Amino acid sequence: MNAFRSLFPSVTQSGCFYHFSQCIYRQVQQHGLQNDYVSEDFSLFIRMLAAIAFIPITDAVDAFDTSLIKICFILHYKYSKHKNYSAEPVVNYFEDNFIGRPDKRGNRRNPVFPLTLWNVNQRVVESLPRTNNSVEGWHCGFQSSLQCSHPTLWKLLDQLIWENELHRLTVAQLLAGQTHTVKRVYRITNERIVNVVADYNNHTFAEFLKGIAHNLQL
């Protein structure tokens, strides 16, 4: 990633929200919390962690500090009397990698992944994709069309020429006004997320994060 940034300094790097959310859920699995994830309270909290990606970058750290930590301790207190239950390992992972842990002076260290990489608020505002699923889908389809893992140079060139013609046709269809259909369930979910983001200033951090979290699946 650093090498890419040095070679293309003017390019804006944006991470994939799907892979971002999967990183969080893998921590749930790693710490043996899959059964706890069935609980609506715990599941909502984990999804609220992922929902921080939809908060404006300037407010993301404050949202983490004022909302998520408080809810984490409430959950810990609620369940710790009954079993060894805590969301703290997931919160620690999130803070180290995406927020930055405070040093002795109270200043936050740089996280492993900067906020500008995983925050998708502006992408929602500008109606830009939040994942690279379409790219991965194309790669999968292209590999399937080759019908082998190591094609000859000529077979690869023939398939690239064919793909180019297909994309020329797609561009022509778009210019003619043909629209790309999206499954109803995805369209409705996206519309809800857009509405919550647009109404950001009328909610507290906790309300906003819950609103986004109700529309997320990890």
Tell me the role of every PLM-derived stretch.
Residues 1-188, 196-200, 205, 216-218:
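Extended amphipathic alpha-helical interaction segments
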